[in-house]
Amino acid sequence: MDFTGAYSPRAFARFLVPLMAAELFQQVYGLINTAVVSHALDDTALAVMGACSGLLAVRGKVLAGMFYGFGICLGTAVGSGDVRRRAVVFSAALRYTLALSALGMLAALGVNGLMDLGNIPPQLRPAAAPYLMLSFAGAGAVGAKLLLVVLLQAVGDTGYFSMLAVLGTLANTVLVVLFIGVLHGGIACAALATVLTNGLLALLLLGYLRRKWPELLQTAPTGGIPAAVWWNLLQNGGAKTLYFFLVALGTLVLQRGINTLAPQLIAAQALALSLQTLLIAPQGELGTASAVITGQNVGAGNRQNILAYHRRLMWLFVILGLTAAALVWLVGPALMRLVAGPDKSTAVTGPALDWLRITVLIFPFSFAILYRNALQALAQYGGVVLLGVLEVLCSAVCAWVLIPRLGFAGSALGVVLSWGASALLGGVLFRRVMKGGVACEG
């Protein structure tokens, strides 16, 4: 889908709605895993998910950052109309994907070091070790899926993956229920189900691309890829990866602080995070749309469309954030019972609901989701990294000041502080770039 011409409401909706729907279904994976674990296993298993969330955030954010960057480069290549440029960009991205998969396998072998880094409580480590090993070893399946997804997004094709995400949710549900509910497996089975589901989606995406978009899979030999392409991908993906890594580092610092609290509170955070991630998913995909649209218009040399589309994305962002906040405050107890189960102790569900009600208040104003993607597509890599540094600093303040003084509520206030501060800085940086007409490279 081409966003370099005049604004078309129908085309915009056809691109955006499937994109948000697909991400919602993707996030249902984590919610289902949490719900099944909460229903079928004890609070210790739920605490393992919560305690490991900081480490898994690092893995997930590094992968997401690289592939967001790859998607921007692919979108810029598509916008340029240069077939050879598109082929060499995809080829380089494919080779980077293989390297990232290998790094995930290596990280899985060092699981004891990972648990030390994450400050995993000793009583949780026997169950946490296989859970982390499977999660990191499955990075290759996640990477293959993400590469094919951003390749489709670069040409504006979001419909198929939206439908495929429904199948993925069903497959993940069946596997989790089978492994944990029927076969009585441990918490590691939740990670295994997610890895298998991602592998299935990657295979189906590859089949679709071979049928409908075979030209997108054209590759070039390693020697035929210019050094500038390697560097542009590394710079683009690396900037977002560094940003995401800094955000994940902040999450890890915050999680280390939370892991000093009672196991029931660690479990409460796991419940709250599963709902928070699902609720903010549509807004996250507005950020993806910002990257795709900005990247295409940078490639086409049409900067005016960037502002036109960005204004529309901002309005949608506020509306979705207010809707999520209203949902949590009005029917939050019912949502919590649905995920945790009616028999879950209020020592877990009560703090989880309070945490969610505090953090959701910042949803309508978390504009950094939009700004960081637009800045990256405009080649403002320093600004992207600066946003990440700010979030780490805010998380450190939370872990070292707010949590020791306010307990579990301090961790929720830390999220509000981090997201709010990065939104303010992101707005300043974006307006400066657009007002100054800073040049950007495709």
Mark where each language-model region is:
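Alpha-helical transmembrane segments of multipass membrane proteins
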Residues: 31-35, 113, 147-151, 173-178, ...
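Helix-loop interface residues and adjacent transmembrane-helix termini in multi-pass membrane transporters
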Residues: 31, 40-43, 77-80, 154-155, ...
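Transmembrane helix-bundle signature of multi-pass secondary active exporters and lipid flippases
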Residues: 19-72, 135-142, 231, 237-296, ...
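Short runs within selected transmembrane alpha-helices of multi-pass transporters and secretion channels
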Residues: 67, 134-153, 161-172, 190-205, ...
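Short alpha-helical transmembrane segments in multi-pass integral membrane proteins
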Residues: 1-16, 74-140, 174, 180-238, ...
